[in-house]
């Protein structure tokens, strides 16, 4: 089922799938990138959860609005979505920009956050491999086509969103590793072993979170969820549905 919800001036498109505990999927960022990115993952998650797939401002079926696109604004939109559409706390599974949004929501509104999965996301923009956010890099042509297929703003607005997101990615986010200590939700950090997010940054994210687990998916890139969907789906579902095991030789988790 597809619908729209007005969130403080942003007419936000979303779909709902499945039954169970609420889970909000937060898609990657980029003009031409939207909830369609979760095609290989949606079925496995909707088999266990009530899945919501909102599309953020300037992405997919949700129109752009005046002013810059910022992580702060997208986090506010997501909090409003949780309050008004979901109606309470949910698991958050975010990929790339969606992971950063999920992290900000977890920091600001722990009352609306159950477990969190951060897939290939950053807490500071220096966590990207430099070529990943080089504003001089032209996006692949297919993204313009994907944008034009669904955007209410039309294909002519595509360069505007490209420019807004390029500016955002070189300046945001700006959290420090010690800020992550304020996250109270149990969190899974996932990254590809050849990701646009550096392994060092993924490890810093894991170490900064007080209750975290880390997965490095072998043989994958920034597109790990679509490159190895069966493996990634299984890891995510297990994390969201099971309690931590008592490990035999804990170091970080030693009490």
Which stretches of residues belong to each language-model region?
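Active-site loop/oxyanion-hole signature of alpha/beta-hydrolase fold enzymes
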Residues: 39, 43-46, 52-93
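Flexible "cap/lid" loop of the alpha/beta hydrolase fold
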Residues: 100-108, 112-146
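Conserved alpha/beta-hydrolase "acid-adjacent" motif
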Residues: 196-201
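Short beta-strand/loop motif that positions the catalytic acidic residue
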Residues: 183, 189-191
């Amino acid at each position: 089922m597809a619908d729209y919800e007005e969130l403080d001036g942003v007419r936000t498109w979303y779909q709902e799938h499945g039954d169970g505990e609420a889970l909000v999927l937060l898609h990657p960022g980029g003009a031409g990138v939207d909830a369609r990115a979760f095609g290989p993952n949606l079925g496995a998650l909707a088999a266990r959860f009530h899945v919501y797939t909102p599309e953020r401002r300037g992405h997919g079926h949700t129109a752009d609005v005046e002013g810059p696109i910022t992580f702060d604004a997208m986090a506010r939109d997501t909090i409003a979505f949780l309050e008004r559409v979901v109606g309470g706390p949910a698991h958050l599974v975010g990929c790339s920009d969606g992971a950063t949004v999920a992290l900000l929501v977890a920091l600001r509104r722990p009352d609306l956050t159950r477990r969190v999965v951060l897939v290939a996301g950053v807490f500071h923009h220096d966590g990207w491999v430099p070529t990943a956010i080089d504003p001089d890099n032209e996006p692949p042509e297919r993204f313009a086509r994907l944008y034009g297929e669904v955007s209410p703003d039309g294909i002519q607005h595509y360069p505007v969103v490209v420019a807004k997101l390029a500016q955002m990615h070189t300046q945001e986010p700006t959290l420090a590793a010690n800020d992550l200590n304020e996250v109270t939700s149990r969190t899974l950090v996932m990254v590809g072993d050849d990701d646009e997010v550096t392994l060092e940054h993924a490890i810093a994210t894991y170490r900064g979170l007080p209750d975290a687990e880390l997965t490095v998916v072998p043989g994958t890139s920034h597109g790990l969820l679509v490159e190895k969907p069966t493996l990634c789906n299984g890891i995510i579902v297990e994390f969201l549905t099971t309690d931590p095991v008592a490990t035999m030789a804990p170091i970080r988790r030693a009490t």
